[in-house]
Amino acid sequence: GTVVDATLIAAPSSTKNAAGSRDPEMHQSKKGKQWYFGMKAHIGVDANSGLVHTVRGTAGNVNDVLEANTLLHGEETEAWGDAGYQGAAKRPDAKSHVRWNIAMRPGKRKLLDKSRLVDALTDELERTKARIRAKVEHPFRVIKRQWGYVKVRYRGLAKNTAQLHTLFALSNLWMARRRLLQGLQA
């Protein structure tokens, strides 16, 4: 299966340049109550290995669900995503053989009465989905925290997306380094 997610990557919001403008391909996006200016990196991660197989770069204002079906490689039967991917199975580009396991919205989950059997089972199902979805966050941690890639380096989506492809390929090597070294020692 595939786990999908997206992260915001900031772009310089300064207009102190020759043109006196921000990057026209980057856009504003709201996360919680905080506004960001930049791009989004959408990734598809293998649910078993945790390695990235698909990377897409878009403007910051592109909704996650619009990219959901482009992040699938085509051979999976199940896909997981957070609440931002609700409705991915109903989209016109949805693949009929893929079963989507989308997280419940946090506000709806808080309203569950865990003393009732049905709600307790629903909450346990959501916990299981969260455990599977956690693998998609690891490549973001490597790129943003390990290597400090929190702000784009170039103007325009094309160059930045090309750099994202390279960074996520390197993050795959970083995350699989122990398995790769064990293969060399054997």
Language-model segments: which ranges?
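Alpha-helical scaffold segments in soluble metabolic enzymes
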Residues: 138, 142, 168, 172-175
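Acidic, contiguous segments within the catalytic cores of piggyBac-derived transposases
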Residues: 123, 129-131, 167, 174, ...
